[in-house]
Amino acid sequence: MSKNIQAIRGMNDILPEQTPLWRYFEKSVAGLLDGYGYRQIRMPIVEFTELFKRSIGEVTDIVEKEMYTFEDRNGDSLTLRPEGTASCVRAVLEHGISGGGQVQKLWYVGPMFRHERPQKGRYRQFHQIGVEVFNLPGPDIDAELIVLTWRLWGLLGLREAVTLELNSLGSSEARARYREALVEYLSARFERLDEDSQRRLSSNPLRILDSKNPETQALLVDAPKLADYLDEDSRQHFEGLKARLDVAGIPYVINPKLVRGLDYYGKTVFEWVTDKLGAQGTVCAGGRYDGLVEQLGGKPTPAVGFAMGVERLVLLLETLERVPAELSRQVDVYFCAFGEAAELAALGLAERLRDALPGLRLAVNAGAGSFKSQLKKADKSGALYALVLGEDELAGRIVGLKSLRAEGEQQSVGWDELGERLAACLRA
């Protein structure tokens, strides 16, 4: 017997009992973004590898270790997208939709791919909802993105579980001055750095600030501080952001070691973190990337955005038991029919109900079965009500209306009154 083929490690099936929560989360985010005037964009999941090398940075863990890269039949190097920002910028440039200073407020949702060690809430195929804004340079739009996420946490009941961390990376010139000071400080202590940090010292020294190695973190306590090297424009931008968050009543923590894992960030960077999921605590992160559009061949264009991890936020909702009870219900109403004539009538009645009550979740029993077995299936579906149609009901042009979640006698309802009566029951 041949061995069953299984899913690739770190790439998981999302089963029917899980998808209602995913849909609830995605619908909550989409509705909120629509309300703020953001428009959806959809990009391909495969891009030329060069896009990510130029945007993310060649000397990053993502490009060096984690990308799924392959050569196609034409000899082109292609990569499954590891994140969405670079693809979105490529699309905006390719189609010219940010030219002439046009403001674009965009969002997307879909799978991303990174070959890293699978762990709780972290997978090799994972899903993100991303938001990107082009041609707005001020701290007001940075604040809007954070206010928007704060509102989302409120809608989902997660505000008490997340903390906002902020930092400013300053201008590229300010970072260059700081980089020199940091390299000088760490070079004198090179032997005490962990292996990854030693490698990064010559290629991407700011990423050392993000090291998880305890000895390296101890060395950084007395290292030069990025805040001391900020240019005046970045300083004012950061103060403007903090002032707006204060007015909005959003608490935050300044984290001077927050640098983000991608090379294109500058000025504002932020993360929403939680301590409810163990070590992998970031659920949403972003910042400003004013130089990326030009870096990818466009004109200088201010830009800012964020991405949130769907798996981690779904896991957080489950961990904190913030899952709405109705999500366990497959349908609102289950139609039981006994006998061929009743089955035919039930089909017609069900379609009339769907016409009369848009949005009604109604399942008609398939596969026949006894009264007891059909009611058992109705109960298992989570339906609030069962409709019962047998020979007697058919003869009298009535339907039995039975509550599955409350005590009470089955009611007989005429076919013409069924839609109105059912609507009243579901509103109650």
From Swiss-Prot:
The enzyme's E.C. designation: 6.1.1.21
UniProt keywords, alphabetically: Aminoacyl-tRNA synthetase, ATP-binding, Cytoplasm, Ligase, Nucleotide-binding, Protein biosynthesis
Catalytic reaction(s) noted: tRNA(His) + L-histidine + ATP = L-histidyl-tRNA(His) + AMP + diphosphate + H(+)
Enzyme class: ligase
SUPFAM superfamilies membership: Class II aaRS ABD-related (SSF52954), Class II aaRS and biotin synthetases (SSF55681)
One function term, GO molecular function aspect: histidine-tRNA ligase activity
Record's subcellular location: Cytoplasm
Recorded GO CC terms: cytoplasm
Stored InterPro entries: aa-tRNA-synth_II (IPR006195), aa-tRNA-synth_II/BPL/LPL (IPR045864), Anticodon-bd (IPR004154), Anticodon-bd_dom_sf (IPR036621), His-tRNA-ligase (IPR015807), HisRS-like_core (IPR041715), HisRS/HisZ (IPR004516)
GO biological process: histidyl-tRNA aminoacylation
Family: Belongs to the class-II aminoacyl-tRNA synthetase family.
Complex and partners: Homodimer.
Protein name: Histidine--tRNA ligase
The organism's taxonomic lineage, starting at the top: Bacteria, Pseudomonadati, Pseudomonadota, Gammaproteobacteria, Pseudomonadales
Gene expressing this chain: hisS
